[in-house]
Every structure is written in structure tokens, then in C-alpha cells.
Swiss-Prot record:
SMART domains: GIDA_assoc_3. The gene is mnmG. InterPro entries: FAD/NAD-bd_sf (IPR036188), GIDA_C_N (IPR049312), MnmG (IPR004416), MnmG-rel (IPR002218), MnmG-rel_CS (IPR020595), MnmG_C (IPR026904), MnmG_C_subdom (IPR047001), MnmG_C_subdom_sf (IPR044920). This is tRNA uridine 5-carboxymethylaminomethyl modification enzyme MnmG. The lineage of its organism: Bacteria, Pseudomonadati, Bacteroidota, Flavobacteriia, Flavobacteriales. GO terms for molecular function: flavin adenine dinucleotide binding. It comes from Flavobacterium johnsoniae (strain ATCC 17061 / DSM 2064 / JCM 8514 / BCRC 14874 / CCUG 350202 / NBRC 14942 / NCIMB 11054 / UW101). SUPFAM superfamilies: FAD/NAD(P)-binding domain.
């Protein structure tokens, strides 16, 4: 049935698996995507949205590298918002509300249109490992499929266990079976496994809600999009979301079910996402809060199904229903399906290399929730990098490893490999020490050249990026070269409560003042004329303005990154014996021996390794 060997087999067709398969196939590897259900490719198992704080930056990075998530998100969006717009550009984060059904449909169409990609529907029960190398997979029907590399992207399906009140049953997602066999094979091969938990809220009938009792949350008046390509356009119409609140009465009703809650009666022992707690966890941990926000999110253009964001729960369904009926606007709510919690297997990511290849088995890669992360975007980015690196290894090419100053994806993977995680890991802007460099507006500058070099990003993408870069640099040069007069400048400065100038000055210096915004710059006739004469779009103008207003911060961060990157150049031999260093702490020796950092810089980020330990290590490395 499968007569030839594949270059890459991807197991699981969620967000990680879809990106992994697309990347490997687009790069030229003969790729097979294996899933338990071809009808459920790229499902949005939880909220119908992509992006958000730090996550939006990741989606733009995926797009800049030639992945599909940004394009699919744009084509299936029903609302766009740029979050944190009141803060500096390092914090701006794009987010879309998505049409859940169209999202999965669009992903499948994109994958079916990808050359070199085959599909197969069946459960993978085991792995073929020979002499420490992956050789293929074994399915539930006993079919063996050979491959030079395998990417595991199993999501919440590995021995998944669903909880609703006192009921529990096996499943990887509501209505779908759990996957068995893979964990057992990996543990037998020497891998360490653990358990994690996540949850999802009930879905309800939007026709049964009274939106007049809620606050309307509209999308941006001038919506943007994720993809840097010309394959998508910004939305011309949008659907609103709504916001309402729980109350003390709602909390009292929820507490009635605590004795039947798997979270409180000991049935669930694994840790859930710290930054996305269940509603019962919120009212238990924050008992002083009189109310909690609930976001009422439509699931698409042509459905009345609604996602109740903020009400994730594993309480009994009767308690869920009774509590929701006490929420303003939900008095007559009708349930489509209850919320639930799910426990699943994961593998501590310190067992991986920065390529996402496992240290134990050559050619085997992990991506997504199997690594202990939570979120579509985190999963998709790992899948993309695993797919890229699986292809590069099979074809004996150098790996693509993103540094912490190059991408949020680099921060994510480095955190996982270097620090590990004992609870579902989600990305935040605060995790990135170089977030002024890693903005959502410049992901193409940072990453498209790398992707183009390995053959993933198209020539059209590269040309578009170069045009944007050249034109924005020309505009910055124009600001530096062009002077403004006292007469045209001071009225604007006084209006903005900024100190007036006593003589003419360069635009760059005036515009770098924090009080001056883009609309103030456009009041200068020379600026307005320059933009019109050069036919510059908003993206180019915004990029130039950011370079002017934040040049000091950007330069400082770049210098700091360059200093630390010097330590990235100091390599540590693969089998270095840390136990021979007598002046190093025992904890440092243990951590370094377990994680096996590749560079001094990575070693310095490991918890329990002190600056003095690094100094000793540098001496041993001859520095």
C-alpha cells in the first residue's frame, strides 16, 4: 500500500501538524500527513480566534516565514482588532475573530493544493525505531509506513481523558477518540512523560441571548490583516463580539457544584494553563472579586453558535446551565454543548534540541501541545519549525534555528528547551527581552530573507519585503535631511503641549518627540507631499514613523542583543563532562548534564546555573 519511503511523516493534523506538513512539502520533501479524521483538519478546538497579545506577533512571523496560518486567518476572519494600540508599537498585537468552520475548510483546501503532500486517515499506534533512529510509523490496522523523519503533533489526543463533573471518558476532543500506543512506545524508548490539563467553555445558541444587556465590542474602524502577501485583503465588513459579567449570584451557583468538580475532588491531578483558568478556579482563587468578564464570541458568519470566552469549566452540566442563566443577557440561554476539561500526555521539552528534534531518537520531532504549550499560535509556529528542520536534516542541510532577538518563535522554543515547563506554556510579550526588535510590523524584515534562502518564502514575498524596507528607509532619510521652520512647527508643538523650538530643525528630531503622532506629521505639507508623490501605503509610512520615534530604544536593544549573541558563538562540545569542573555547583552540573546546552548563552538561561558557574565554564572553553 505504501511502497516508497517518505522524507517526512507528520502525525496529527491540528495547527502544528498542518504547518509542519505544509512546510516540509513546500520545501520539496515527499510528505505524508496522517490523522485520525480527515474531516477534522486544523480544528479550532477552543476559541474561534487567532492572534492576540504576543500570539499575533507569532502569526505574522509564521506568515513571514512562508507558513499558512496568517493567510488562512485573514481569509476566514469575521473581525479584526489591533490590541494594545494605546501602548508603544512593541506591544501592538493583531487578533482576528474567526469563522470556525471556514477556518478548517480553508486549511484543508490549502493543504490539498500543496505539492508533494499525501494524506492518510488512521490512528498511529506506534513508532518504528531502529538503532536510535526513527524509521517510520505503525498504525492501528498494522500498516507500517517507512520514513526518514517523523514529526509528532498529537495535541491533546495522547491518552486524552475528558471530564464533565463526575463523568469522565476517553477522548482527544469532544466526540473524538483518544490516541493510544505512542506514549507507551516513547516511554519504552527512554522518554520522560507527564500529564497536563486544559479546558473549554460551553457553546450556546446566540438566538437565545439578549445582547441589549451586554456591551458591544466592535472591530477596528480600519482593519489590518496578518499576511504580508497580496493573497489576502483586509475585511470590508465585520461581526461584533459582546461583553457581559458574572455576578455574586453566579458565583454562589457555581460553588454548589464544587463537591462534584473534578478540579476540587481530586480526579484531575495535572496542571492547567495558569493564564487561562477555569471559571471555578477564578472564583476560588479570587474570592474577593465580585464579577469576572465574559466575552460572547460568534463562531462564524453563518451560524448562531456562540463561544462563551471566560467560562471554561469542568463543572457538572446542570451547574453550568444554571449559572449561565443567571448571567446578564443569558437568562433564556440554550446550550449547544457543555464545557469540559481534558487531561493528556506531554513530554517535557528539555528532551529536545533547538531544531525540535528529540535528543534520544534521531529524526524524530515534537511540536505543539506534546511539548507542553497551549494555544493555536504556539503550536503552529513549532509545527512550522519542526517541518522545516525535518526537511533540512533529511536533505543534509544546515538547520534553521531562530534566536531570541530574531523572533518570538525563537523565544518560545528556547524557553521550552532551556527552561522546560510544568504547566501549559503560553507566550507573552513579557517573555521576550527584545520585544522592541520583535514587533508585529517588522516580522517580514526579520524572517523572510532567512526563509527565502532555504527555499520556503517565495520570490514575490522577498521582493515585497525589499520594496517595503527600501521605501521606509528612504522616508527615514527624508526626515533626517529635511528641515522645518519655526512658523510651521511651533503651532503644532504648542497644541501638543511640547516645548516650542527657537530655530529651524530637522524633521527627524522634531518628530522623535513623544507627543508628536503620525497625524501631527501629516500636517506638514512636505510630509504629505512626499507620501503622495512616492505613492506610499500605510504600512511603509507606519514603519518609517516607528523607526523615527523609537530609534533610541531600537538601537539600545540591538546593542544588548549583539553583546549576548557573542556568547551564542561560544559552543559547548556535545558530550562535555560537567562533573569534572570542581568549582561548579552541584545543581548547575545536574541541570547542564540533563539539558545539554549547545552554547554558553543557552547555558546562562538555565534555572539553577549562576553567573559564577558560567564564568567557570567560560574558562574551561578557553575564553
Amino acid at each position: 500500500m505504501f511502497l516508497e519511503e517518505y522524507d517526512v511523516i507528520v502525525v496529527g493534523a491540528g495547527h502544528a501538524g498542518s504547518e509542519a506538513a505544509a512546510a516540509a512539502a513546500n520545501l520539496g520533501s515527499k510528505t505524508l500527513l496522517v490523522t485520525m479524521s480527515l474531516q477534522n483538519i486544523a480544528q479550532m478546538s477552543c476559541n474561534p480566534a487567532m492572534g492576540g497579545i504576543a500570539k499575533g506577533q507569532i502569526v505574522r512571523e509564521i506568515d513571514a516565514l512562508g507558513g499558512y496560518s496568517g493567510i488562512v486567518s485573514d481569509r476566514t476572519a469575521i473581525q479584526f482588532k489591533m490590541l494594545n494600540k494605546s501602548k508603544g508599537p512593541a506591544m501592538w498585537s493583531p487578533r482576528v475573530q474567526s469563522d470556525r468552520m471556514r477556518f478548517a475548510e480553508e486549511w484543508r483546501m490549502m493543504l490539498e493544493g500543496t505539492p508533494n503532500l499525501d494524506f492518510y486517515q488512521e490512528m498511529v499506534k506506534g513508532l518504528i525505531i531502529e538503532n536510535g533512529k526513527i524509521k517510520g510509523i505503525r498504525t492501528s490496522l498494522g500498516v507500517e509506513i517507512r520514513s526518514k523523519s517523523v514529526v509528532l503533533t498529537n495535541g491533546t489526543f495522547l491518552n486524552g481523558l475528558i471530564h464533565i463533573g463526575e463523568k469522565q471518558f476517553g477522548g482527544g476532543r469532544a466526540g473524538e477518540s483518544a490516541a493510544t500506543g505512542i506514549t507507551e512506545d516513547l516511554v519504552k524508548a527512554g522518554f520522560e512523560a507527564g500529564r497536563m490539563k486544559t479546558g473549554t467553555p460551553p457553546r450556546v445558541d446566540g438566538r437565545s441571548l439578549d445582547y441589549s444587556k451586554m456591551n458591544e465590542e466592535k472591530g477596528d474602524a480600519k482593519p489590518d490583516k496578518f499576511s504580508y502577501s497580496d493573497l489576502t485583503k483586509p475585511l470590508t465588513q465585520q461581526r461584533s463580539c459582546y461583553m457581559t459579567y458574572t455576578s455574586l449570584n453566579v458565583h454562589d451557583i457555581l460553588r454548589e457544584g464544587f463537591d462534584r468538580s473534578p478540579m476540587f475532588n481530586g480526579r484531575i491531578k495535572s496542571l492547567g494553563p495558569r493564564y487561562c483558568p477555569s471559571i471555578e478556579d477564578k472564583i476560588n482563587r479570587f474570592a474577593d472579586k465580585e464579577r469576572h468578564q465574559l466575552f460572547v464570541e460568534p463562531e462564524g458568519w453563518n451560524t448562531c453558535e456562540v463561544y462563551v470566552n471566560g467560562f471554561s469549566t469542568s463543572l457538572p452540566e446542570d451547574i453550568q446551565f444554571k449559572a449561565l442563566r443567571s448571567v446578564a443577557g443569558f437568562e433564556n440561554v440554550k446550550f449547544f454543548r457543555p464545557g469540559y476539561a481534558i487531561e493528556y500526555d506531554y513530554f517535557p521539552p528539555t528532551q529536545l534540541k533547538h531544531t525540535l528534534e528529540t535528543k534520544l531518537v534521531e529524526g524524530l520531532y515534537f511540536a505543539g501541545q506534546i511539548n507542553g504549550t497551549t494555544g493555536y499560535e504556539e503550536a503552529a509556529s513549532q509545527g512550522l519549525m519542526a517541518g522545516i528542520n525535518a526537511h533540512l536534516k533529511v536533505h543534509e542541510k544546515a538547520p534553521l534555528i531562530l534566536k531570541r532577538d530574531e523572533a518570538y518563535i525563537g523565544v518560545l522554543i528556547d524557553d521550552l528547551i532551556t527552561k522546560g515547563t510544568e504547566e501549559p506554556y503560553r507566550m507573552f510579550t513579557s517573555r521576550a527581552e527584545y520585544r522592541t526588535l520583535l514587533r508585529q510590523d517588522n516580522a517580514d524584515f526579520r524572517l523572510t530573507p532567512m526563509s527565502f534562502e532555504i527555499g520556503l518564502a517565495s520570490e514575490d514575498r522577498m521582493r515585497r519585503m525589499e520594496h517595503k524596507l527600501n521605501e521606509s528607509e528612504k522616508m527615514v532619510a527624508f526626515f533626517k535631511e529635511t528641515s522645518v521652520t519655526v512658523a510651521e512647527t511651533n503651532p503644532i508643538l504648542i497644541e501638543k503641549e511640547s516645548a516650542p523650538i527657537s530655530q529651524g530643525d530637522k524633521m527627524f528630531k522634531v518628530f522623535s518627540r513623544p507627543q508628536i503622532e503620525l497625524e501631527d506629521m501629516l500636517k506638514f505639507e512636505k510630509v504629505d507631499s512626499y507620501i503622495k508623490e512616492n505613492n506610499l501605503d500605510e504600512e511603509i509610512v507606519e514603519q518609517a514613523v516607528i523607526q523615527v520615534k523609537y530609534s533610541g530604544y531600537i538601537e539600545k536593544e540591538r546593542n544588548n542583543a549583539d553583546k549576548l549573541n557573542r556568547l551564542e558563538e561560544v559552543k559547548i562540545p556535545e558530550n562535555f563532562d560537567y562533573n569534572k569542573i570542581k568549582s561548579m555547583s552541584i545543581e548547575a552540573k545536574q541541570k547542564l548534564s540533563k539539558i545539554r546546552p549547545v552554547t554558553i548563552s543557552q547555558a546562562s538561561r538555565i534555572s539553577g546555573v549562576s553567573p559564577s558557574d558560567i564564568s567557570v565554564l567560560l574558562i574551561y572553553m578557553g575564553r
